[in-house]
Amino acid sequence: MNIVITGAKGFVGKNLKADLTSTTDHHIFEVHRQTKEEELESALLKADFVVHLAGVNRPELDKEFSLGNVSYLDHVLDILTRNTKKPAILLSSSIQATQDNPYGESKLQGEQLLREYAEEYGNTVYIYRWPNLFGKWCKPNYNSVIATFCYKIARNEEIQVNNRNVELTLNYVDDIVAEIKRAIEGNPTIENGVPTVPNVFKVTLGEIVDLLYKYKQSRLDRTLPKLDNLFEKDLYSTYLSYLPSTDFSYPLLMNVDDRGSFTEFIKTPDRGQVSVNISKPGITKGNHWHHTKNEKFLVVSGKGVIRFRHINDDEIIEYYVSGDKLEVVDIPVGYTHNIENLGDTDMVTIMWVNEMFDPNQPDTYFLEV
């Protein structure tokens, strides 16, 4: 299928093009400000589907709203009258189309123009009124508060919040792209007779700001945010996409001694924490037990043995472990345990524990295996 994307260099256009080229065999024609007239005409006359994303939202003069959102669409439709395949057309409109302002009025005029075209020429059309959008590749300091806040917070720049209680209606760009793909396949999401993008979020500005600062702090205290809330999951992915390319990595605190090292990697309030333990050859670590704290050990490099003994018994249980055969070993409560490096190289063990370490209540009691 030949798909034309106008506004292909914009926020949604870049995400849509990246997805379509990665997941489909469609031939994509990109139309943008640098596209020559003959290239535009050639693409539109070959089109099986047109995704019209091009538009204007922050011009210097109000009259540019009409030029960008109505006149350009009219020009595209004029060319499409000569496309005998009658391609379906998807228009990105805005929830502001119902509002009395130059931008909203131009969007409404564009909708009316497309409907009239469909009635006259018989093309299938999909008109989507999108709310505020967020996601990767959205231009900061322009038209998106989330993009601007992500960019600034990731760079330790000050942000301005005039009213924390302002509620935003939002769609995530991946949901937009998924819906466009459904429309291309002829299976759009229709609610009350209107094409709709699922997963509309209503979130206050204050909630967004608080989450973004938590995400920033999480790199310092080695925590992971809760990701069971879809909006928070999408916002976290968005925030990370605005990290400076020189700031992808961050240091961990390595506790190093002559036995090796122990380093906390990730901590969560409800799923425990993950650490990396490195033991030098011949070293034994552990010899303690827990009442409630439980662990999982996974040796990923080297070889060794994990020994257990019930604190009320003399029997010693051994599990031989190796990075050549990845196996998880559960560490039950009430068993004293240790881990010994039996190899000639460092042994690396991933350790999960069911709770974050609390120095005031470590639940760890020394006892030789």
Segments the model singles out, each with a brief description of its role:
Residues 3-19:
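N-terminal Rossmann NAD(P)H-binding glycine-rich loop of SDR-like oxidoreductase domains
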Residues 35-75, 79-83, 96-100:
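NAD(P)H-binding glycine-rich loop region in Rossmannoid oxidoreductase-like domains
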Residues 74-111, 118-121, 126-128:
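Conserved Rossmann-fold NAD(P)-dependent oxidoreductase catalytic core, especially the SDR/UDP-sugar
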Residues 112-137, 147-151, 157-166:
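Conserved beta-loop-beta element that borders a ligand/cofactor-binding pocket
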Residues 140-148, 162-185, 206-210:
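Substrate-positioning beta->alpha
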Residues 182-254:
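Mid/C-terminal beta-alpha module of Rossmann-like enzyme folds, strongest
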Residues 248-287, 293:
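A short glycine-rich, His/Asp/Glu-containing loop-to-beta-strand
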Residues 313-315, 342-369:
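Double-stranded beta-helix
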